[in-house]
Amino acid sequence: MTKMEMGQSQHHEFWTIGLNVHGHDCRLPKSSLCWKTFYPLVDTQLVRRQPRPRLPKFTTIGQWYWGGSVEVNGTFPDLSKKIAFEPYLDLPKRIPEARFELAMNIKAEDSEKARLRERGWHIVDPHRVARTPSAYRRYMAGALAEFTAIKGVDVAWRTGWLSDRAAAFLALGRPVITEDTGAEKYIPWGSGFRFVRDAREAETAVKEVLWDWARLSKEARNGAVEIFDSAENLRRILAL
């Protein structure tokens, strides 16, 4: 994005969900573009808080493998979820009372699926559980919370990136346990997030969700409405 790629020369403004793009600790390459930041959006009128699910499930939806390539300091690092999740794979054994699930693109014959199952992870097909927008929301509502790891470049470069998927989980009343990309300082405490840096912190966050879900669920919903609501954010972006 420092080389005017993807037709940027035709744009008048440049917006990013990298909340920390102007932070002193952000390690993104310096750019001549004047980036403005905004929060990921969720329609909080469409995506409503849902009752507590039956199973103590922690899940996320994404691509386990990533076939793209991004040059970082002259190298092309592996930006897959496979690499990102590696430090957390023992969580099912450390917290047997929780169900850890991944809706990821891992084929039945892939040895990676067997490896994850041996570590206690449940694997489901994202093209089945999230095949439509309504199915996507139902699947997320079936979890107590989102647990996810972030591609390494966002963590290492302190971009402040957050996903719109996280905003949707919050709107459903589902707390979000995720790695900190530098976004934590832009999110008020008590907004449904638990930012973690290693497996020990993740274990603490999961256990907190298990024993104090009702409070955290309410915080998550309030955080979605107050921070990520699409109508409010679009008004700010358009200066209405």
Regions from the PLM with identified roles:
Residues 5-6, 49-50, 185:
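Short secondary-structure boundary/capping segments
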Residues 79-82, 86, 112-240:
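Catalytic binding pocket for nucleotide-activated donors in carbohydrate/polymer assembly enzymes
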Residues 18-22, 105-111, 179-183:
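Short, polar loop motifs at secondary-structure junctions
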Residues 27-142, 153:
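Conserved catalytic-core segment of nucleotide-activated headgroup transferases in glycan assembly
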Residues 1-38:
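Active-site-proximal region of nucleotide-activated glycan assembly enzymes
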Residues 6, 92-93, 210:
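N-terminal cationic-hydrophobic initiation segments that often serve targeting/anchoring roles
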Residues 13-17, 59-61, 99-105, 147-148, ...:
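A structural signal for short, well-ordered beta-strand segments and their strand-loop junctions
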Residues 8-9, 30, 95-97, 118, ...:
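Short, well-ordered coil/turn elements that cap or connect secondary structure elements
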